[in-house]
């Protein structure tokens, strides 16, 4: 005869996979056109010059250059890419 009572199954024990959100390219980093700069939910950061936005609010570079972060008067954070041609001048 068994002397151990059958253990009940737990209702816990699951978790969703992390979505790997956040900044992928930081201020001052070089990017090429098409590089993902930020993955986000909603528009915590807004696209500035030479930055596009995907349908999932991902910000990506539209030109080769350097990433720049700044906050405007309306208290929104903007991400821009300063083109490489402008930097060289």
Curated annotation (Swiss-Prot):
Region of interest called Disordered, as start-end residue ranges on this chain: 1-20
Parts of the chain that traverse the membrane: none
GO cellular component, one term: cytosolic large ribosomal subunit
Highest taxon in the source lineage: Bacteria
Coiled-coil parts of chain: none
Keywords from the named record: Ribonucleoprotein, Ribosomal protein
InterPro entries for this protein: Ribosomal_bL27, Ribosomal_bL27_CS
GO MF, one example: structural constituent of ribosome
Similarity field: Belongs to the bacterial ribosomal protein bL27 family.
Protein name, as recorded: Large ribosomal subunit protein bL27
